[in-house]
Amino acid sequence: MNNLNSVFDYEDIQLIPNKCVINSRSEADTSVKLGNYTFKLPVVPANMQTIIDDKIAEMLAKEGYFYIMHRFEAENRAAFIKKMHKDGLIASISVGVKADEHAFIREISAEALIPEFITIDIAHGHADSVIKTIQLIKRLMPQTFVIAGNVGTPEAVRELENAGADATKVGIGPGKVCITKVKTGFGTGGWQLAAVKWCAKAASKPVIADGGIRTHGDVAKSIRMGATMVMVGSLFAAHEESPGQTVERDGQLFKEYFGSASEYQKGEHKNVEGKKILLPHKGSLKDTLKEMEEDLQSSISYAGGRDLSALTKVDYVVVKNSIWNGDAI
């Protein structure tokens, strides 16, 4: 492993500007290629029940954004693939690693319901069960782009890539509603950005940074450290379109946001590694996506380039938790 004394996270880093070469930030190209497809932004909403549902998945696909449908309504997945393909849209689903999930993979393969993207989605992705699932998907559906995770070490990235994964998802418990670090003592919470850097250096295929994104600038920082795509949870939660339940408190509207390993998602208090919080009700998800695109265009202009590749070359400084100068975000 790399030098474990030089870890850092998003709030510890500032990117250093270069000379601007475009006349307007609107000239900057934020598009990214993943597999055989090009998407409008290097950002994907987290595949969580309070972030994405069928309607949001359809909207994102139609608008040219990448999405990953969650796996918590397993019985609807085959119908979801059918509908997306019928509408001429890409199908991107999540699977687990247990026997019933392997049966599902065999079933959709036999029915020629082949999704363009499958994400193998478990909390600790450096596991034999994940490797077996990658190998099964690649044997039955070689053309499907397989994302595997979640992991937090270069060794894990290499092993999943060697098993056939087309991309790896990096992040163990840094998310806002994830309490893995508290419950288990393990994870990338507090050093997620360093983990992204280390894992991306070891990777020969795309890395998706997952968790710990609190501001739009964190997307640019993730790309600087080697991420191709950035998974975002809390920033995409609590919108008008979001599936979470709306709650009124003291005249203000909030929406529920809970983790994928919380008792609220699992329906039982067993092996809980997530919690539920209320977030202030936000406006339209489309507005947030547009704002994120504009902020990323500004990042590209500060990087002195015309597209996302400029962000991968900028210098940065480590300022250890001081970039807010005492201000709240």
Swiss-Prot record:
Coiled coil: none annotated. The keyword Oxidoreductase applies. One of its GO terms (cellular component) is cytosol. This is GMP reductase. InterPro entries: Aldolase_TIM, Dihydroorotate_DH_CS, GMP_reductase, GuaC_type_2, IMP_DH/GMP_Rdtase_CS, IMP_DH_GMPRt. The gene is guaC. NADP(+) binds at residues 207-230. It catalyses: IMP + NH4(+) + NADP(+) = GMP + NADPH + 2 H(+). The lineage of its organism: Bacteria, Bacillati, Bacillota, Bacilli, Lactobacillales. PROSITE patterns: IMP_DH_GMP_RED. Belongs to the IMPDH/GMPR family. GuaC type 2 subfamily.
